[in-house]
Amino acid sequence: MTHKQRAIFEPALVRTALLDAVKKLDPRVQWRNPVMFVVYLGSWLTTLIWLAILSGHTTGSAMFTGSIALWLWFTVLFANMAEALAEGRSKAQAASLRGVKKTSWAKKLSEARVDAPQEKVSADSLRKGDLVLIEAGDTVPCDGEVLEGGASVDESAITGESAPVIRESGGDFSSVTGGTRVLSDWLVVECRVNPGETFLDRMIAMVEGAKRRKTPNEVALTILLVALTIVFLLATATLYPFSVFSVEASQAGSPVTITVLVALLVCLIPTTIGGLLSAIGVAGMSRMLGANVIATSGRAVEAAGDVDVLLLDKTGTITLGNRQASEFLPAPGVTEQQLADAAQLSSLADETPEGRSIVVLAKQRFNLRERDLHSLNATFIPFSAQTRMSGVNVQERMIRKGAVDAIRRHVESNQGHFPPAVDDLVASVARTGGTPLVVAEGSRVLGVVALKDIVKGGIKERFAELRKMGIKTVMITGDNRLTAAAIAAEAGVDDFLAEATPEAKLALIRQYQAEGRLVAMTGDGTNDAPALAQADVAVAMNSGTQAAKEAGNMVDLDSNPTKLIEVVHIGKQMLMTRGSLTTFSIANDVAKYFAIIPAAFAATYPQLNALNIMQLHSPSSAILSAVIFNALVIVFLIPLALKGVSYKAMSAAALLRRNLWIYGLGGLLVPFVGIKLIDLLLTALNMG
């Protein structure tokens, strides 16, 4: 699935959003947003007053009351439109996902063997624990774990990546996703979910917002907005008896009308952020999907914005992950060429990046050409987790290369001696951030091959940006402490965890959380699952195991560990957008005071005309201008709510100052200009 950024006001989206905005006028929908529900009730009240004026049941200006009622309905519709546009973008993304999900058949097995009896069943009938055989050309019918076999799988329908991936039993690449397609070979898979619970189903549900619940910050902000609304409601309600009393006492003017009080209330309550709050949350999840990351909830996106500790795997995130041979360091009594020759021989059949780089380096340094192991009557010894060595047996020569402790045991078991000088070479390589690979022939240590893991370009600058934002970066690696310290210094991370185990990762996360910090991490293996489940933001790789994906609260479809940094940026942008628009909305009220208060009460208290600093044409024009501005500002802020405010890496204090200047001062000044321009237009049209 390819996630293209859709234009905010794309005609098809706007048409759908307009229809949805009208449907959302249902009171069962409106009451979920308390601030806009007050506007909704005000719209009905002023509409009824307008109808009463038209029918002669009460007195008043039908033109003025009708205009106020119309623009209050527009205010509600514009808020509905903002939410509908955000949801529309998500629904379009969900539609493309739903296109991936199609009815298919599965070959259900009675036991986990490729030659076991099979039964053809509908994929929708499969249950957790069922076994299926998937062959070349078949669509994977369910999410599951590969128990037998290995195959090339096309996951482009889910990830958008056209290159096929290998899925095989054992290891961290044993997970398959329903809706993908097997290109070659076969797999025996155990289903790990029931119908309706697949990864694709969860993606569709989250993208559509069907399970969207308000996040803690959203709930807290809603409580604040409701409290402000109640305060302004009580204040406005007391103005009517105050107005009646003032008119009787001064024998001047007339009591303020219900229509004017409703207009005043709507202009004073925080309708701007109230109307855009839901859209901001939906758009945050949509932007996350645009980055090819599926968030299981808005809570996860919000937590990403609050993160202050990042745990980053060294390989693939900080370094390129393909270690290259950079130097031959011979032991005393051995020439560099002798070491290079032995290292190359032991690597001729080694297809790892490290092995190929040793062959290339020997060729570059000493013009040692590749040789055919078969013609040499040689036997290649592959690497194994038990021996932690690989090598070659050539006639009487027994050459091995591997980790320091593995070669030490090998040499000593052959009654050899491990020279202290080689220990010094190993320490020297580790101190510079390299990985030492020791080469031995029989019982004799020949020297060390230095493998250099290249730190990604620009990663140090990105970590510096994160540091400015108050985020601590911690590198996680299985390397020894010396190597880890050197790479950490080169990459510019704040701390590191060397010789990391799953238990050590989990303990580190708990330690930071005990200090009140929020922790983010990535993982792809079953052994990462406990740490992923503990972390506040846990991004599981789509290429990883089912256990890892279930433990995380986000899944990266690109399986790119570096994406964690982008996830944090998107989360922070969502929080900043919400805060900026809240500041703008509350600052807006000041200009509306200066517009409506003199208009409502100047006839009784002429001294209040001094507050008419905008020199608005008439009381009715002033009130109508404020109501129109209040509605239109929601429309103008929809793009900002959906795209997010511009984001720069800086400290929280600097961000606060910047946003107060832009959105606080802007919120104060823009309404003065906007209301005055609308007043001039109404006057020119003879509507004021």
From Swiss-Prot:
Keywords linked to the UniProt accession: ATP-binding, Cell inner membrane, Cell membrane, Ion transport, Magnesium, Membrane, Metal-binding, Nucleotide-binding, Phosphoprotein, Potassium, Potassium transport, Translocase, Transmembrane, Transmembrane helix, Transport
- Give the top-rank taxon of the lineage listed in the UniProt record for this protein: Bacteria
Q: How does it sit in the membrane?
A: Multi-pass membrane protein
**Positions of the catalytic residues:** D313 (4-aspartylphosphate intermediate)
Q: Which residues bind Mg(2+)?
A: D524, D528
User: What SUPFAM superfamilies does the record point to?
Assistant: Calcium ATPase, transduction domain A (SSF81653), Calcium ATPase, transmembrane domain M (SSF81665), HAD-like (SSF56784), Metal cation-transporting ATPase, ATP-binding domain N (SSF81660)
Question: Which reaction does this chain catalyze?
Answer: K(+)(out) + ATP + H2O = K(+)(in) + ADP + phosphate + H(+)
UniProt keyword Cell membrane, yes or no: yes
Question: What Gene3D superfamilies does this protein map onto?
Answer: Calcium-transporting ATPase, cytoplasmic domain N (3.40.1110.10), Calcium-transporting ATPase, cytoplasmic transduction domain A (2.70.150.10), HAD superfamily/HAD-like (3.40.50.1000)
Q: Which HAMAP family match?
A: KdpB
Known function: Part of the high-affinity ATP-driven potassium transport (or Kdp) system, which catalyzes the hydrolysis of ATP coupled with the electrogenic transport of potassium into the cytoplasm. This subunit is responsible for energy coupling to the transport system and for the release of the potassium ions to the cytoplasm.
**Name of protein:** Potassium-transporting ATPase ATP-binding subunit
Q: What is the lineage of its organism?
A: Bacteria, Pseudomonadati, Pseudomonadota, Gammaproteobacteria, Enterobacterales
